[in-house]
């Protein structure tokens, strides 16, 4: 596929092609501004591609309504989104026939159930400006919401830089749980977390410049290897 933003002349993605199998983990890596979110925007049909096709189970997303495409995906983004309403309402979010047992099971699965039970009204606690949640707690709630939606495809933004180490481990564990049995697209910031990805797309200046798994890309000793080694050195230091 090829994609150019409206009002510009140079394609930000040019002649890119890949096939993703059900249940695979795809990591999208690159420096800030490399175009990682462009891939997400195209998958979600926020923009139409210039040439080529994006298909889900053989069906061209160009022939699908945007809402139908969105139904196929669960998203957990760096900027967590919660609305004014009870915790239960935030977890169920627009879904029908979700039981209390399912809500509690999802919260337990991601490790946020205990925190919810410590609140004065538990799952009926109304979230507004008077309730202060940490970044990590918000992230875990949105992961529980995604688990409840149970969509076959996932988009995860892995950024956890604004939380402490213990919370980061909780979030990573919850994300791993969420990815089980689902096809996942992970916007990776810490490369150490995506070494087990089935496919890594390496982006720079809007282009996909390398692709392969971790071992293949390290053996190629290119941009990804430099990125990984520099980050690993920083983490060790």
Residue ranges and their predicted role:
Residues 1-237:
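ABC-type nucleotide-binding domain
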């Amino acid at each position: 596929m090829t994609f150019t933003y409206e009002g510009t002349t140079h394609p930000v993605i040019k002649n890119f092609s890949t096939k993703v199998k059900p249940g695979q983990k795809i990591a999208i890596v690159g420096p800030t501004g490399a175009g990682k979110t462009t891939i997400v925007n195209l998958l979600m049909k926020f923009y139409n591609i210039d040439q080529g096709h994006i298909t889900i189970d053989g069906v061209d997303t160009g022939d699908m309504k945007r809402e139908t495409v969105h139904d196929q995906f669960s998203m957990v983004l760096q900027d967590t989104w919660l609305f004014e309403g009870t915790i239960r309402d935030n977890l169920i979010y627009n879904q029908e026939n979700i039981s209390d047992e399912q809500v509690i099971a999802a919260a337990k699965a991601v490790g946020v159930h205990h925190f919810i039970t410590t609140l004065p009204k538990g799952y009926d606690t109304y979230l507004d400006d008077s309730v202060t949640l940490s970044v990590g707690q918000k992230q875990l709630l949105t992961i529980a919401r995604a688990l409840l939606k149970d969509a076959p495809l996932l988009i995860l933004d892995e950024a956890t830089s604004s939380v402490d180490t213990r919370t980061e481990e909780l979030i990573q564990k919850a994300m791993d749980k969420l990815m089980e049995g689902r096809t996942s697209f992970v916007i990776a910031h810490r490369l150490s977390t995506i070494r087990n990805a089935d496919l890594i797309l390496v982006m720079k200046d809007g282009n996909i410049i390398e692709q392969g798994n971790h071992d293949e890309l390290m053996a190629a000793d290119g941009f990804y290897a430099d990125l990984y080694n520099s980050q690993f050195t920083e983490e060790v230091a």
